[in-house]
UniProtKB/Swiss-Prot annotation:
It is an enzyme of class 1 (oxidoreductase). This is Probable malate:quinone oxidoreductase 4. Its EC number is 1.1.5.4. Pathway: Carbohydrate metabolism; tricarboxylic acid cycle; oxaloacetate from (S)-malate (quinone route): step 1/1. GO terms for biological process: tricarboxylic acid cycle. It comes from the Bacteria.
Length: 499
């Protein structure tokens, strides 16, 4: 790359998305100057943190909201294929970072864990069986197992079967090649690698407070050093806003037209965590149920084995809790400051359109620990209050926007890339399955905003992500080859012995 092509990039936020994009960019454009600013004192403290992340290892293996029943009764698995491919892309990039020595000890951030779906009730059992039949036919999911036999379920999920009798309708499906991912640890590893890289500057306790567009087309970014209160400005070619819940207010400060007619509604996640090691040891899976009728996808409960600080833990949730902060370490004025003359009708229209969601949120806010425990007992009937404690996880800011297709006040689920017309400002908005698909999101950012570099960068990207430019959905042989390679690179051990 010629020196005349050298650019300067500012990354805002040291979460999984910024550190992923930064890690990728420093490899494909090593001469570019990258400056990462994080207002907290270390990386991965907000939504990427392992105690704040609402769901880990999203691969559409057990999350039932990615497989939707159609009016004719058939099951559409297209979204599940897409999510699974994106997770396979993420695993390739992480494997590359391990193989290249940029990060070490993959077991500190990813571990094998069965992914299981569990349902009760006649209609739900039929849905799960139909889903199994649809997924079994597709090579990406042909290792799925299904049972309605309670004795088999006792082997898969012994803790959840305690106290259950062999009556009523119950079913479960299982894919053993699932994982638990500690995105906090992964983020910390990538941030440290960035800090050790040439042409990269990582600054903690530095808050981006404003932007100004300059006549030369660059941006002047105003940054406050929270250690001493000093404010300075940095000129840059590109601004990347990967600040989680803080992305919308920062995007609004740029003043770009694309920041208008969108807003956000903050939702906290609450979990109940098991404190009894004897109970924790009896569960070894990520188990998802089905959302209650008439509730949004975010309401899907799950009982998860997780690895935090090298120890096995057990969490159940999430339960929503509404508050005005956009970040866990944010301000109670965040929501109110984000309401502008240009987006107030968007937010009001959303409120009118989404009364069931508002009712659900209110019901969740007033839920006590007893209510949480009652939900848990639908998964684990013998759960005792004294073995569990409630804790507040991270924030998600649900994006609300106007679209031609859905009109004003449409709630956008998932992760979305927003950029200025000239591609100098790029912001990542949204939530689940954000962290799990972070590498695909970073690739989307590159493809949408740096098309003039695509030809030069493609060979470097393919070295990091061998399936880049090809379909793991359509190419079965490639998909199986990639899975075996990432299992080896990440020390998952999925294919070490024949089934």
């Amino acid at each position: 790359m010629a020196m005349s092509d050298k650019k300067d990039v500012v990354l805002i936020g040291a979460g999984v998305l910024s550190t992923t994009f930064g890690s990728m960019l420093k490899t494909i454009a090593p001469d570019w100057d990258i400056h990462l600013y994080e207002r907290l004192d270390r990386p991965g403290i907000e939504s990427s943190n392992e105690r704040n992340n609402a769901g880990t290892g999203h691969a559409a293996l057990c999350e039932l909201n990615y497989t939707v029943q159609q009016p004719d009764g058939s099951i559409d698995i297209e979204k599940a294929k897409e999510i699974n491919e994106q997770f396979e892309i993420s695993k390739q990039f992480w494997g590359h970072l391990v193989k290249s020595g940029e990060i070490q000890n993959p077991k500190e951030f990813i571990n094998p864990l069965p992914h299981i779906s569990f349902v009760r009730g006649k209609n739900n059992v039929k849905f799960l069986k139909d889903r199994y039949e649809a997924m079994k036919q597709f090579p990406m999911f042909d290792n799925i197992e299904y049972t309605e036999d309670i004795e088999e379920m006792r082997k898969w999920i012994p803790l959840m079967m305690k106290g259950r009798e062999d009556k009523g309708y119950m079913a479960a499906s299982k894919i053993d090649e699932g994982t638990d991912v500690n995105y906090g640890e992964l983020t910390r590893k990538m941030a440290q690698n960035l800090k050790n890289s040439p042409n990269v500057e990582v600054q903690y306790k530095h808050e981006v407070v404003d932007f100004e567009r300059l006549s030369n087309g660059k941006w002047s970014v105003k940054i406050k050093n929270l250690n001493n209160g000093q404010v300075f400005e940095h000129q840059t070619d590109y601004v990347f806003i990967g600040a989680g819940g803080g992305a919308i207010p920062l995007l609004q400060k740029t003043g770009i037209p694309e920041s208008k007619h969108l807003g956000g509604f903050p939702i906290s996640g609450q979990f109940i965590a098991c404190t009894n090691p004897q109970v924790i040891e009896q569960h070894d899976a990520k188990v998802y149920g089905k959302e209650p009728p008439g509730t949004p996808p975010m309401t899907v409960p799950h009982l998860d084995t997780r690895y935090i600080d090298g120890e096995r833990t057990l969490l159940f949730g999430p339960f929503a809790n509404v508050g005005p902060k956009f970040l866990k370490h944010g301000s109670n004025l965040d929501l109110f400051k984000s309401i502008k003359p240009y987006n107030i009708t968007t937010l009001l229209a959303s409120a009118v359109k989404n009364l069931p969601l508002i009712k659900y949120s209110f019901d969740q806010v007033i839920m006590t620990k007893e209510g949480c425990m009652n939900h848990l007992r639908t998964f684990y009937p013998e759960a005792r209050d004294e073995d569990w404690q409630v804790y507040t996880a991270g924030k998600r800011v649900q994006v609300i926007k106007d679209t031609e297709e859905n009109g004003k006040g449409f709630i956008q689920f998932g992760t979305e890339v927003v950029n200025s017309e000239d591609h100098s400002v790029i912001a990542l908005l949204g939530e689940s399955p954000g962290a799990s698909t972070s590498v695909s999101v970073a690739l989307e950012v590159l493809e949408k905003n740096f098309p003039e570099y695509a030809k030069d960068w493609e060979p470097k990207i393919k070295k990091m992500i061998p399936s880049y430019g090809e379909s793991l959905i359509d190419d079965v042989q490639l998909m199986r080859k990639i899975r075996k390679q990432t299992s080896k690179d990440l020390e998952l051990g999925f294919y070490n012995k024949a089934k």
